[in-house]
């Protein structure tokens, strides 16, 4: 036992460098939950996906692949972190206007009840 209670799944650098697919990330989320830990699922679009209007599609694809088959209880135990790949990989300024636009894209995103305040009031 490591004493770990949170595990990051789907970080963009692991997806890119280690070729982790959405399905593979989904398997990791399920394993983390099975061991009683809390997965932090990272989702985010590339600059090309953002500029071509594919942001919503990409985010939903990542979330569907990672969260499919989870029970309502498991969904509540999962944290979703929006991590725009373009802000990390391309050293673009991660302006709050982009973040606000992204999180308003689909109100069906899953977030932890305890994190609702941060979700709605992000600067």
Show which residues each predicted segment covers.
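Active-site loop-to-helix "anion-binding N-cap" substructures in soluble metabolic enzymes
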Residues: 1-110, 114-116, 122-123
């Amino acid at each position: 036992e490591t004493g770990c209670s949170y595990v990051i799944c789907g970080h963009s650098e692991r997806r890119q460098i280690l070729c982790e697919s959405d399905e593979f990330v989904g398997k990791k989320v399920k394993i983390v939950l099975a061991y009683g830990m809390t997965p932090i699922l990272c989702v985010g679009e590339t600059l090309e996906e953002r500029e071509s209007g594919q942001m919503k599609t990409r985010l939903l694809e990542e979330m569907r692949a990672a969260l499919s088959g989870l029970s309502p209880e498991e969904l509540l135990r999962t944290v979703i972190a929006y991590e725009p790949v373009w802000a990390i990989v391309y050293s673009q300024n991660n302006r709050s206007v982009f973040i606000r636009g992204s999180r308003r894209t689909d109100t069906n995103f899953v977030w932890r009840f305890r994190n609702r305040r941060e979700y709605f009031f992000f600067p």
